[in-house]
């Protein structure tokens, strides 16, 4: 009887936002893992207006018992699609995963289910050593991916939605800010968690981030993300290093100079960043300079 009540308590919805990525392999892997836990589960995908080819490829997942693919006709962005998934989920615990990931450990789901409670749990992520996405992989591996011990020092600032576990009741109370269409929506969600007094627990339960994004595309996405910070300087200052640097430049009246230096060096910066040996320091200046240019 105790075992049965525990199974009911641990009912899990695995939620995957989809945009132009075939996630059949990921879902089949998660499905096999979930069967081994013996807990009730569902896998729910929400397609954010992908191309026809990707939609057709992912529809095969509807044949799996407990798996649903929901398709939206217009693109809304990651914040909206995660809120939509949380609303559509049937079970009391939610596991959000990005489509370009793959669990590292075979006990991936079990580790999350051991941490069921009134908290958010972040498992982290890592990058394969080899890959052609030089800038994206280098930035991800050296800046974004951090061990749990490091993430615990600033748990809310280190929240990233690529791989996290949350009670549905808490998620629906906090939700993602849908005014962030793409970029820093994770940061805003971390702030909302802190404002609500919800604990964030960081553990070692990573996924591989199997990114396939050339540097030029990553720079376009970076610029879109940086634009999201305009008008949010005060709100996100404690959470975003770029804004703290910008604030320092403002104090020294150096924003216009930084914007000018960015504009005259932009092509040289992009030449380095799209090459095989991109400099992360130059990438940091690229983002800061672009934000300064937007601000003047």
Outline where the language-model segments fall.
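Acidic donor-binding segment of Leloir-type glycosyltransferases
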Residues: 30-71
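Glycine-rich, basic loop-to-helix element that forms the pyrophosphate-binding segment
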Residues: 72-89
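Short aromatic/hydrophobic "clamp" motif used to bind/position activated sugar donors
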Residues: 94
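A recurrent flexible, glycine/aromatic-enriched loop bordering the glycosyltransferase active site
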Residues: 147-166, 181-182
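Acidic donor-binding loop at a coil-to-helix junction in glycosyltransferase catalytic cores
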Residues: 182-189
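Active-site donor/metal-binding and catalytic loop motifs
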Residues: 196, 201-236
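Non-catalytic, C-terminal membrane-associated alpha-helical segments of glycosyltransferases
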Residues: 224-228, 239-296
